[in-house]
Amino acid sequence: METFVCLFKDSPQQRSDAWHAARRTQVGGSDLASVLGLNPYKSYYITLAEKANLFKKNLNRAACSWGTLFERVSKDLLELFCQTTVIGDNIHIDGTYLGYPGHSNSPDGFCYLTLGYTQQSWEIKTIFNNVCYEATKRIPVLVEIKSPYNRKIKNSVPSYYMPQIQSGLALSPPISMGIYVEAMFRVCGIHQLGWNNETNIDIHPPESMLPLAWGIITICSTQEHTEAPQDFGTLDAETFRQLLETLYQKDQYTIHYSMPYETACPEMPNVVGYFGWKVFIFQIIPVMKHPQFLKDKYPIIQQFLRDLHTIKASPSPMETYEKICCSEESPLSTEDIDNFTDMLT
């Protein structure tokens, strides 16, 4: 696994300008469900228009910021709960090296997990499993993390995320299993941190269970800031959403994370504020590799790339786009552009 990850150490770092530029000309793992027609929130044609730059992305920035903030926390918790280390969480795998040009995947990482055998089956060993296993084995896995803002978490992988995981597995030959990690985080004030179910109920519904872990996210300005830090965990829902949208401007702030179970705010310069978090659900769902997945789906990716090239090369991109759209598919509408971001929330 380590040798494989090292192959891509010089690839564009995730969320860098070079990474964004590469993704504009490729079908990434997160695009795949839409391209295959499996995403109920975003169609092949909306994805095509987005890649062809026919409209300005209307992302749900609050939900994007939330997912980015808690991806790091989820990795820390995965390492703690499974006694492992996540690597390769910043690489970009270009499918060209495996014969799939135009397709890529940017995994959330790779790690080793311990599987324990009991009652004629294998399960993922965590610090919460108080089980004496008949046998154990350590295997490398691909990691895919989601942290929905308010969407309910079910004990299964949403169908529109499965292509992203299978894409990552297909482009990672040494790996035969992935894990889908989905966590339910809730915001709280610093005074609410600890072994209790107190959260900011203006932002989230009340919780009846106790948290698995908690911690603090600290937000610092990149400029000199001398005002007293604010406890963002006590904000009302709308103001907190506005804060998340502001954090989307990454050049204005730096984000710092406490270790899990920390309750004391860190002392550092230019702190604008902080908020507490608690995690109440942390699911780790195994996903086995489908050996033929990418080979079977690649012709659709190729068709998408041909359509994209045709639009970009046209002197009238929008007119060409409309011709490419299926007869039953209307051209871009404001509703379509807005609706696909609902998946993030």
Curated annotation (Swiss-Prot):
Question: InterPro entries of this UniProt entry?
Answer: NF-kappa-B_Signaling_Reg (IPR051703), PDDEXK-like_dom_sf (IPR011604), Restrct_endonuc-II-like (IPR011335), YqaJ_viral_recombinase (IPR019080)
What SUPFAM superfamilies is this protein classified in?
A: Restriction endonuclease-like
Organism the protein comes from:
African swine fever virus (isolate Warthog/Namibia/Wart80/1980) (ASFV)
**Quaternary state and interactors:** Interacts with IKKA/CHUK and IKBKB.
Q: Does the keyword Nucleus apply?
A: no
One cellular component term (GO) for this entry is: host cell cytoplasm
Q: Its biological function?
A: Plays a role in the negative regulation of host NF-kappa-B signaling pathway. Mechanistically, recruits IKKA/CHUK and IKBKB to suppress their kinase activity towards NFKBIA.
Enumerate the Gene Ontology biological process terms. Answer: symbiont-mediated suppression of host NF-kappaB cascade
- Principal location listed in the UniProt entry: host cell
| Protein keywords | Host cytoplasm, Host-virus interaction, Inhibition of host NF-kappa-B by virus
State the family named in the UniProt similarity comment for this chain.
Belongs to the asfivirus D345L family.
Localisation per UniProt entry:
Host cytoplasm
User: How is this protein named in the record?
Assistant: Protein D345L
Which superkingdom heads the taxonomic lineage of this protein's source? Viruses
